[in-house]
């Protein structure tokens, strides 16, 4: 699965640009499409507004890591892996037995977007299994990216030369598109383009970028992890208007 969004809508963490090597290898969004088509010849590319797009492929799919894609009501969702509590979630959201993992996630998003009074991380925490997914609501411009807490499903993200956000489960594509300006998407975390990156197991604590240096002292990569010593000023846990479609940044998280 792949998603590429321009800087204005993707709002990627600035720390992804820290690596000082490989900047010359960054590709344009159109270049990335050609890379995808060469590596995933059977891929389906979903063209979005302003040159943004998502893509899915069944290349190297396995029973342990199935893939599911759904497009409905201008909401695009691609998931790799499986929700172990899918039966419970189907029943909770009133979905038929045929509903796929991607359908379950979209329904959860729609219900929370329209009615929920509790934070998004609380809902992601209820998802059990080995999974990584990307969701985009074309009407609201909302992007949601999440990965299971064990990091069982491969997922990487990066930033291109023009500041576009790239997220993909294939390191070859992310690396070729972003050079050194890419990193593993942190396990147990959710990213929303309106509010940034947070841990759904430790939502009260900041997620920080940590730079890696080579033997010459140059930054060659970054990784993101929860800083259990830095507590966020406040996150409403109940009775809040915050939900998956929120666009207000949490104080203290603007630069994540």
Regions of interest found by a model, annotated:
Residues 1-256:
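Cysteine-centered catalytic environments shared across enzyme families
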């Amino acid at each position: 699965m792949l998603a590429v969004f321009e800087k204005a809508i993707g709002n990627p963490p600035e720390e992804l640009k820290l690596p000082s090597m490989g900047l010359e290898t960054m590709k344009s969004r159109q270049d990335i499409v050609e890379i995808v088509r060469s590596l995933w010849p059977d891929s389906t590319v979903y063209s979005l507004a302003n040159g943004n797009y998502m893509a899915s492929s069944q290349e190297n799919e396995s029973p342990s890591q199935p893939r599911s894609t759904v497009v409905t009501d201008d909401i695009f969702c691609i998931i790799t892996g499986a929700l172990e509590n899918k039966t419970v979630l189907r029943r909770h959201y009133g979905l038929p037995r045929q509903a796929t993992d991607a359908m379950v996630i979209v329904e959860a998003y729609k219900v929370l977007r329209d009615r929920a009074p509790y934070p998004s991380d609380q809902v992601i925490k209820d998802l059990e299994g080995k999974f990584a997914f990307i969701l985009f609501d074309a009407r609201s411009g909302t992007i949601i990216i999440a990965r299971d807490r064990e990091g069982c499903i491969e997922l990487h993200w990066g930033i291109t030369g023009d500041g576009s956000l790239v997220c993909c489960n294939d390191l070859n594509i992310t690396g070729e598109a972003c050079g050194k300006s890419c990193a593993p998407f942190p396990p147990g975390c959710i990213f929303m383009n309106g509010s940034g990156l947070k841990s759904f197991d430790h939502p009260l604590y900041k997620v920080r970028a940590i730079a890696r240096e080579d033997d010459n002292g140059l930054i060659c990569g970054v990784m993101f992890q929860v800083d259990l010593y830095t507590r966020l000023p406040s996150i409403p846990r109940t009775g809040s208007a915050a939900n998956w479609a929120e666009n207000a940044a949490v104080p203290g998280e603007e630069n994540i």
